[in-house]
Amino acid sequence: MHEMALMGDILNIIIEDANKKGIKQFHQVELMVGELSNAMPDALRMAFTIYKEQNPHIFSEDASLHIQYEEAI
């Protein structure tokens, strides 16, 4: 399941950028996933939940992941 590694990389980029901007905690993450990425939204949600539970100092208790899925045309 490459979604776990993918979500880890995405969150590392977000956290790095947030640190530069002085943002301390996340309440929502929005992600656009294309059909050709072969990333499964349900697996990304599961990975997000795991990272959220492992990093309570970064994510609020009610932090959520919103995925917009784009079909290939």
Where are these regions (language model features)?
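Short secondary-structure junctions
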Residues: 18-23, 57-60
